[in-house]
């Protein structure tokens, strides 16, 4: 479907990706950050990167914890890389520091701790706690217009700046 669209599709990873395949692509630089170019019109925006697109700055940080990982097979339907590495956390923070913690938009798969809690989602594992805590520190320190995420499979808004997308499509400008 995406191949036939007259646009370039940009995406961040979630928690059900085949990370072995995704990470088999060469890491390249694109609009200021690291990417995997899947095809000419399909680009994976890697974790902890800042991209300038049409004059707007985007911080990206994919990944999330799979609550159903016990029913999945490692390396087939579940990959430990769903949780960010120490290097990804550190690189993301360093990239935000370079921008004085000022971006236009933040795109993540899961939400910061306080936002997830406001939506009624508790924490299920130490890995999930660490990721949501990291995103909470990013939220507390960074100036941004909107933060978009989607892990919870619902359309919702928290405090007018945190937006969970599932069925809804928004245009950023």
Regions found by a protein language model. Give the residues of each.
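Active-site-proximal loop/helix segment associated with metal-binding centers of metalloenzymes
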Residues: 33, 40, 53-129
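Short His-Asn-centered micro-motif
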Residues: 12-15, 47, 61, 108-109, ...
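Core catalytic region of metal-dependent phosphoesterases/phosphodiesterases
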Residues: 1-52, 131-132, 140-141, 166-167
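Active-site environment of divalent metal-dependent phosphoester hydrolases
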Residues: 15-21, 51, 66-69, 112-116, ...
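Binuclear metal-dependent phosphoesterase catalytic core
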Residues: 52-54, 126, 136-141, 152-173
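Short, glycine/charged-enriched secondary-structure capping and boundary segments
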Residues: 24-28, 73-75, 120-123, 161-164
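Cap/insert and terminal regions of metallo-dependent hydrolase folds
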Residues: 1-4, 104-152
